[in-house]
Design a protein with these regions (language model features):
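Bacterial Sec-dependent N-terminal signal peptides
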Residues: 3-9, 15-43
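Segments that shape or occlude catalytic/ligand-binding pockets
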Residues: 30-227
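Generic cytosolic/nucleocytoplasmic N-terminal low-complexity/intrinsically disordered segments
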Residues: 1-2, 68
Length: 227
């Protein structure tokens, strides 16, 4: 057997195994026509509504009250906590939780996640970039001003599971469904709509993922689609 034929056979076997591993769960049937208030596109600010405001010392880019970037004209001797307090429009109920940092010859940054009353805000937080002298240069991310949101769910997790199963017409065993609880901001037409929501995730193939957000107070399915 030629080496090329052997290699082709091995490659074909690998591809077959990959396709098998990437197949979706046949026991899960999603209702593709489920009508929801939002889609995955509403989970990030739209670029058309980003506004930049430049002053003598910095440029702030925002979406409504949401800060997406703070860039200083020159490096400043400020801690991230000082910037959070002085530049970001968040109340005391919001906090920026340290996640990790890295400093080497090529980069110097620290990552923070946003929480509101102890509940993580979905995909919100920021990365702080410093020069090699630990002077702050810029902040990038997404910081949402969350206020007056009740973080105590009205409906239970088990009830949210029932809503999920009934709406998606799925054959889930409720004992094997797990949900996360998040503060979730949705962005639409320059406005922000913040909900306390349960999240369910289901992987589809190798790269796709279905995310379903269920309002933890009303039980409304806020969004359910493939991303």
């Amino acid at each position: 057997m030629k080496k090329s034929d052997l290699f082709s056979g091995i490659l074909a076997s690998i591809l077959l195994l990959a396709m098998t591993a990437c197949s979706s769960d046949e026991d899960v049937i999603y209702d593709q026509n489920l009508d929801c208030k939002y889609t995955w596109q509403n989970l990030d600010p739209q670029y058309d509504f980003l506004v930049s405001n430049t002053t003598d010392d910095k440029t702030i880019t925002s979406y409504g009250d949401v800060i997406t970037r703070v860039e200083f004209n020159t490096s400043v001797s400020l801690s991230p906590e000082q910037v959070f307090a002085d530049y970001l429009p968040i109340s005391e109920d919001n906090c920026m939780m340290f996640e990790n940092s890295l400093k080497n010859n090529d980069t110097n940054y620290a990552c923070y996640s946003q929480c509101y009353k102890g509940v993580r805000v979905w995909y919100c937080g920021c990365d702080c970039y410093f020069d090699q002298n630990d002077q702050l240069e810029k902040i990038e991310g997404k910081v949402v001003p969350v206020n007056n949101l009740d973080v105590n769910p009205t409906i239970s997790e088990s009830k949210a599971m029932e809503i999920l199963i009934n709406a998606l017409h799925s054959d889930y065993d409720i004992n094997y469904v797990s949900l996360g609880l998040f503060v979730v901001p949705f962005f639409a037409d320059g406005k922000i709509d913040v909900h306390l929501a349960y999240l369910h995730e289901q992987y589809e193939g190798c790269f796709g993922i279905y995310r379903t957000f269920i309002d933890a107070h009303s039980g409304e399915i806020l969004s359910c689609d493939l991303r």
